[in-house]
Amino acid sequence: MNSMYRIYPQKRYRKTLTILERFAPKGTTILDLGVRNPFSEVMEKEGYIVNNTQGEDLDLFPEKLADYTGELVTALEILEHLVNPFEVLQHLPAQRLLVTVPLRLWFASAYRNDKDPRDCHYHEFEDWQLDMLLEKAGWRIKYREKWTHPVGKLGIRPLLRYFTPRYYAVYAERIIDDEYRVKKI
């Protein structure tokens, strides 16, 4: 198993699952962007039908999303890894979307794994940036929530993590016809 999943992010999983349950009843078919991961299993154990993408490079081939179906798409800790999340958001094959992203922290650098070029954050959003991206890509935000992520270490930065929101979740629905634009895909 990937080393990043050795210790489950309990708080993030709990918060994400609570939001999912609010907007998607058990039995909902979910397209979970990204390869299968521990949270895919959590969703299945909670009664959801989960399909994952297969590791396609969605930056280069967002149209591959047409090969998938789902009543709701989850993009959980995914958009920050994409060079161009706008194209992916436009090509999602569902009318409902749950997104979580790490927020940009003013006191920490963006995440980067020097050993794996796919494991880095091209974007660490501020909440308003993700909101604008979603709206521009044709989604209407219905719910949003932020939370902190304390790390249990000593120091100034760990202390700041107790007070500074680290994660941002958004539930949105596709705009079918809007005064600003008409969805064309």
Task: Give residue spans per PLM region.
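A short beta-strand submotif of the Rossmann-like class I SAM-dependent methyltransferase core
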Residues: L72-I78
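Short N-terminal helix/helix-N-cap motif within the alpha/beta-hydrolase-1
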Residues: V83-E87, S109
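Short, glycine-/aromatic-enriched active-site segment of Class I SAM-dependent methyltransferases
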Residues: V99-H123
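Conserved N-terminal segment of class I S-adenosyl-L-methionine
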Residues: M1-L72, F86-H91, Q95, P117-M132, ...
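A structural motif corresponding to the C-terminal end of an alpha-helix
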Residues: L133-W139
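Active-site flanking residues adjacent to catalytic metal/cofactor-binding acidic residues
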Residues: L31, L76, V99
